[in-house]
């Protein structure tokens, strides 16, 4: 590993290139508007590590610019990964835009290895508030972890204050342990391992162990920490027997910036082992390659893909789906679920979505606000294709997101307009967890509300305009939201365009204009491969 000066920050970039146009691919690193480094030239089919010492920046915040000199984006299968001084992944992504994409990344550690903590041990009882920030630990001893060699008797308790940052997506906490452990952030339990259920006491013994002490971790939403303020990390270590033990605990906490645009979400960057019950090319479902895909054949639904995470265990509360140009064959309905008991067939639903529509080469993101948890394994069930009898999943990325609990129902649009009889109406809330849904006043004739999903669908039978309020429930809490709907008569000529094609339809388009090339003009991009597609009914003047 490269050794950096005290005023420098270590970083490792891993760049993957393919066999074509690798010489067009590069990246730059900035601190604000200041260019700090430019990547070296990369070779054909290369997986290359580049270590660098960056100058210190405010809170060690930087940005990476993904560049393609050919202005046709990186080749499918090319990606870049960024790791910090402890080898933890702080960014991983691939390029979809033609010539440039910009992402923030953070090399800030709220807690670093070998720092000073507060330490004590108990053999009988401990104050219940010991995990809270306001607890008085002045009587606890100071211990610099990693070099503290004294033995202590009983269950070991640790406390460490730290400062988090604003506008982050997640944090990664890795801890060095062998036996039982329970960790808390600001008084809330965030992790336990090798421990029975229930509130632990100093006499609670661990259950199970690793062969030796090593670092194991979690990635959780940054909403669990207070930005730019004091926080407390509290950890208790339990052992198979009550006795005297050495102190071999240590930990670090990395604060992670968003790795997708528009939403405060972090893409899981470590390797993932995937397996499926049916279909082909399952490894393509999450391989940072934009044109590879996993297929669920006709008549073989549901396609079940299990994600087994090899690095820190993520608290997945978001899913991002890349449809490439196959928007008609991308998953039209799915369930994302998790479980902690590998011997059980029971899975807990986290996110479910149906009647999904896509735009060609545009990500679609789904969130879970109240049904997420820290699971050992996750499963993605594809229930149907969006508009085909089979399904293709090009890239399904698990996300850890900083999400605020919703205060109301927000729809994909505040206002909708559709033509009478000729357009299929689909109106859905952005949050997919709402249920027990009702609407007032009554919907126009031809439309109905699904009370389980809050999705409104159908075809308007007559012209009407109005504002509608939907009431729904999440975990016994009522939420409300409204939208305006205009169902209008077509005053001109209705044109239905049907077009067939074999491949690369996303490169083609058409326009409809009046005779003097003014007024109406509508250009539609088509994206599904090898399918007959009815574009839409188009009203013209």
Task: Place the predicted regions along the sequence by residue.
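C-terminal edge beta-strand
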Residues: 478-488
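Accessory carbohydrate-binding/adhesion or oligomerization-edge regions at the termini
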Residues: 2, 6-8, 91-147, 172, ...
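Strand-loop-strand motifs at the edges of beta-sheets in extracellular beta-sandwich domains
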Residues: 445-461
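Short beta-strand-plus-loop segments that form exposed binding edges in beta-rich domains
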Residues: 15-18, 65-72, 235-243, 380-388, ...
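Edge beta-strands of jelly-roll/beta-sandwich modules across compartments, strongly enriched
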Residues: 73-81, 242-251, 387-401, 508
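Aromatic-lined ligand-binding clefts that engage carbohydrates, nucleic acids, or primary amines
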Residues: 12, 64-65, 140, 162, ...
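Solvent-exposed, low-complexity, repeat-rich "mucin-like" stalks and linkers
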Residues: 406-437
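Aromatic, loop-rich ligand-recognition surfaces of beta-strand-rich domains
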Residues: 257-262, 280-349, 362-404
């Amino acid at each position: 590993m490269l050794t950096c000066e005290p005023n420098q920050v270590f970083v490792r970039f891993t760049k993957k290139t393919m066999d074509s146009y690798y010489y067009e691919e590069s990246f730059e690193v900035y601190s604000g508007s200041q260019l700090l480094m430019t990547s070296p030239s990369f070779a054909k089919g290369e997986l290359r590590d580049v270590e660098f010492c960056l100058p210190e920046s405010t809170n060690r915040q930087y940005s990476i610019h993904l560049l393609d000199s050919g202005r046709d984006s990186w080749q499918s299968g090319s990606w870049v990964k960024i790791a910090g001084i402890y080898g933890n992944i702080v960014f991983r992504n691939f390029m979809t835009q033609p010539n440039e994409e910009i992402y923030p990344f953070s090399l800030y550690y709220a807690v670093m290895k070998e720092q000073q903590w507060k330490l004590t041990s108990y053999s009988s009882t401990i104050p219940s508030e010991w995990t809270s920030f306001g607890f008085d630990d002045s009587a606890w001893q100071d211990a610099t972890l990693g070099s503290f060699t004294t033995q202590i008797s009983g269950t070991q308790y640790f406390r460490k204050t730290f400062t988090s940052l604003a506008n982050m997506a997640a944090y990664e906490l890795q801890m060095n342990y062998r036996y039982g452990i329970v960790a808390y952030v600001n008084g809330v339990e965030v992790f336990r391992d090798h421990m029975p259920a229930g509130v632990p006491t100093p006499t609670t013994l661990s259950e199970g162990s690793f062969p030796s002490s090593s670092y194991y971790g979690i990635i959780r939403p940054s909403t669990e920490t207070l930005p730019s303020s004091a926080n407390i990390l509290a950890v208790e270590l339990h052992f198979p027997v009550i006795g005297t033990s050495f102190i071999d605990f240590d930990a670090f906490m990395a604060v992670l910036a968003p790795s997708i645009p528009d939403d405060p979400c972090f893409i899981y960057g470590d390797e993932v082992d995937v397996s499926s019950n049916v279909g082909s090319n399952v490894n393509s479902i999450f391989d940072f390659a934009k044109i590879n895909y996993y297929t669920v054949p006709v008549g073989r639904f549901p396609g079940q893909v299990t994600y087994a995470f090899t690095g820190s265990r993520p608290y997945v509360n978001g899913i991002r789906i890349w449809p490439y140009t196959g928007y008609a064959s991308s998953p039209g309905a799915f369930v994302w679920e998790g479980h902690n008991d590998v011997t059980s067939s029971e899975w807990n639903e986290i996110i479910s979505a149906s009647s999904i529509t896509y735009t060609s080469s545009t990500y679609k993101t789904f969130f879970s606000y109240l049904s997420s948890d820290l699971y050992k394994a996750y499963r993605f069930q594809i229930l149907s294709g969006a508009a085909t009898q089979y399904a293709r999943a090009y890239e399904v990325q698990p996300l850890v997101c900083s999400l605020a609990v919703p205060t109301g129902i927000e729809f994909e649009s505040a206002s909708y307009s559709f033509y009478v009889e000729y357009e299929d109406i689909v109106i859905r809330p952005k949050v997919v967890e709402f249920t027990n849904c009702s609407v007032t006043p009554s919907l126009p004739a031809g439309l109905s509300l699904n009370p389980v999903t809050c999705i409104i669908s159908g075809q308007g039978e007559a012209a009407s305009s109005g504002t509608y309020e939907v009431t729904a429930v999440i975990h016994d809490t009522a939420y409300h939201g409204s939208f305006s709907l205009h169902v209008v008569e077509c005053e001109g000529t209705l044109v239905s365009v049907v077009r067939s094609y074999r491949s690369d339809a996303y490169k083609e388009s058409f326009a409809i204009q009046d005779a003097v090339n003014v007024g109406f003009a509508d250009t539609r991009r088509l994206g599904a491969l090898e399918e007959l597609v009815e574009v839409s009914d188009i009203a013209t003047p």
